């Protein structure tokens, strides 16, 4: 295994040297990094490899990633296309700063029913935790308003609330090194303790 590993590393280093001269395949992330992928959520980079090392002309360098919530799944993302699809997971400091700003993050409110689901989709695909907070706040407010009117939460609202909440809590859980199930209470406790009278 070690021989194979060192051979793979040598190939990558050699190709990166050539690639850097050509301005392609710049490796931005490292093995062991936690990154956020739209819709999927947080993944750990397990390897950086060529899928076909024998074909230097047509082969691409890939990140091999495993979602933190499904380590059996493998995701391959081309290094050359990673900027638009990946970002580093929040640091612990960034996570606390986000929690601190939650009360001030504007609600992504829209009165256009036809555009609402599209807005939800865009927020989920944006790979931006603030966008997730914005639609979570919006859907929560809509739910409370509908309950006051004797109506149930819509299926679309319920689905995207669950998706957004899962993605947000997953990232905050990894950043804060806490179980995802504890994040909601962590947020509530922090905001309650830091309220300004």
Language-model segments: what does each one mean?
Residues 1-5:
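Short, small-residue-biased leader/transition segments that mark boundaries at the very start
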Residues 7-23:
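Short, positively charged and aromatic/hydrophobic N-terminal segments
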Residues 52-62:
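Short, solvent-exposed secondary-structure boundary/capping segments
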Residues 41-51:
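Short beta-strand-centered aromatic/proline hotspots
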Residues 64-66, 70-80:
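A short macromolecule-binding patch
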Residues 80-197:
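Charge/polar-rich, low-complexity and marginally structured segments
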């Amino acid at each position: 295994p070690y021989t194979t590993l060192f051979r793979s590393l040598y190939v990558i280093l050699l190709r990166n040297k050539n690639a850097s001269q050509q301005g392609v395949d710049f490796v931005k992330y490292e093995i062991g990094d936690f990154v956020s992928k739209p819709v999927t959520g947080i993944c750990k980079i397990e390897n950086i490899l060529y899928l076909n090392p024998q074909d230097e002309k047509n082969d691409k360098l890939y990140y091999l990633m495993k979602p933190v919530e499904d380590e059996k799944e493998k995701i391959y993302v081309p290094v050359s296309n990673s900027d638009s699809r990946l970002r580093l997971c929040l640091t612990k400091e960034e996570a606390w700063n986000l929690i601190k700003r939650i009360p001030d993050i504007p609600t992504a409110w829209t009165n256009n029913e036809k555009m609402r689901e599209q807005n939800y989709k865009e927020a989920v695909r944006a790979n931006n935790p603030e966008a997730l907070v914005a639609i979570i706040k919006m859907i929560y407010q809509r739910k409370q308003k509908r309950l006051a009117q004797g109506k149930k939460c819509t299926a679309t609202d319920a689905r995207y609330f669950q998706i957004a909440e899962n993605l947000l809590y997953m990232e905050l859980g990894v950043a804060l090194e806490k179980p995802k199930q504890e994040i909601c209470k962590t947020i509530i406790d922090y905001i309650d303790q830091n309220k300004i009278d």
